Amino acid sequence: MELNTLKSTFINNFGKEPNSLFFSPGRINLIGEHIDYNGGFVFPCPITLGTFAAATLRDDRICRAYSLNFESLGVIEFSLDDLSYKKEDNWTNYLKGVLKVLIEKGYKIDKGIDLVINGNLPNGAGLSSSASLEMLIVKILDTFFSLNISKVDAALIGKEVENTYIGVNSGIMDQFAISLGEKDKAILLDCNSLYYEYVPLNLGDNSIIIMNTNKRRELADSKYNERRKECDDSLDTLKKYTNISSLCELTSLEFETYKDKIEDSNKLRRCVHAISENERVKDAVKALKENNLELFGQLMNQSHISLRDDYEVTGKELDTLAENAWKQPGVLGARMTGAGFGGCAIAIVNNNHVDEFIKNVGQAYKDAIGYEASFYVASIGNGPTEL
C-alpha cells in the first residue's frame, strides 16, 4: 500500500515513474541510554517501521524532493551548487547535508535526484526518524553513483551531517543501529572504538511493545545538549586525576575513588548514570546470551530508574508508561528508549498478555496524562535496502 502511494505521488509530482524504491528502518535501543556520547556500550536494533523512498537520477544538477509527511511544503527544489542550510527547506536539509558531506569527502556526485519519501515512524517519537532519513539518503546516493560506501562509513557520514550541518550534538548509535541492522538481531556497540557484535534477539514467547507518549520531543532544543555539556565538564574534571578519554572507561568501583572531585551534585548524578548504565548493558547482553530474560528485564527497569532519578530525562509521560508497565502481568521489563523528554518507552511482554497490557497501560496513561498513548508490537528488521 505504502509503495503504491509512493509511486503515484512520484508520478503526480514529477510526471514519470521512479527508477528505484528504497527503505530505511527506525531503531529502538534496548538498553544503554545517553551513553553513546560518553564512550559506552549500547544495545540497539532496527525496527520494521521506517522511511520509504522513490527516487530517480536526473541528468542535471537540480534536486527536487517531496515528502508525504510534510505535504504542505510541496516540492522543494535546490541545486548541487548551493547546499547551504536553509531553515525553510525543512526536512530536505538532511538531503542537502548528506550531499554536502559526501561531496566534501571527495565522492563524485555530479547529478541531482528527484525524490519522494514517506515515513511511518511517528515523527518526534524518538525512534530516530532523522537517522533513518540520513541512512536512506546515503543508500540512495551510494546506489545511484556506485560510491561503495561501507555500512560503518555510512553511519559516520550520518553522524557528521547531524553534528556539523544540522547542529545536533548526537552520538553514533542511531545511524550505526540502522546502517548495520540485521533482521532479528540487536547490535552490541562500543561507541568509543566502534567494535560491534550481533546478538540474536531470542525473546522466547515475548514481544517488544513500543509505547509512544505522543508527546513530541525535539532533540535539538531539548535538554539533550545540556546533558552532554554536564558530562563533558565532568570528564574534563576527571581527566586531571585519571587517564581516561570518556566517562564510561571507568567502572563504578573506580569512580568511587574520584567522585568527590565532582563538586556539582547534578553533574555527579549524571556521571553515576553513565557509568552504571554502561555496566548494565554488559550485564544485560550476558543475561540475554544465557537466556536469563528475567534478569534482562530487571536491568531494563533499573535503567529507567537511573534515567529518571540520576539523569533526569524521562518526565511525567514516560514515567507513567514505564511505571504502569511494571505493574502488569507478563511484563519482564520496561524503560524509556531514545533521548527522553517525551518520545517512546519499550516493554518486553509475554505474548499471552499483550492485549491486556495495551488496554491497562493505555487506560492508566489516559487517566494520568489526559490524552492517549499509541502502542506498536515491534518487529526487528533489516538495515537500509533497495526494494
Swiss-Prot record:
GO terms for cellular component: cytosol. SUPFAM superfamilies: GHMP Kinase, C-terminal domain, Ribosomal protein S5 domain 2-like. Pfam families: GalKase_gal_bdg, GHMP_kinases_C, GHMP_kinases_N. ATP binds at S67, G124, A125, G126, L127, S128, S129, S130. It is found in: Cytoplasm. GO terms for molecular function: ATP binding; galactokinase activity; magnesium ion binding. One of its GO terms (biological process) is galactose metabolic process. It comes from the Bacteria. It is an enzyme of class 2 (transferase). InterPro entries: Galactokinase, Galactokinase_bac, Galactokinase_CS, GalKase_N, GHMP_kinase_C_dom, GHMP_kinase_C_sf, GHMP_kinase_N_dom, GHMP_knse_ATP-bd_CS. Substrate binds at E33, H34, I35, D36, Y224. The active site is at D174. Catalyzes the transfer of the gamma-phosphate of ATP to D-galactose to form alpha-D-galactose-1-phosphate (Gal-1-P). PANTHER family: GALACTOKINASE-RELATED, MEVALONATE KINASE/GALACTOKINASE. This is Galactokinase. It comes from Clostridium perfringens (strain SM101 / Type A). The gene is galK.
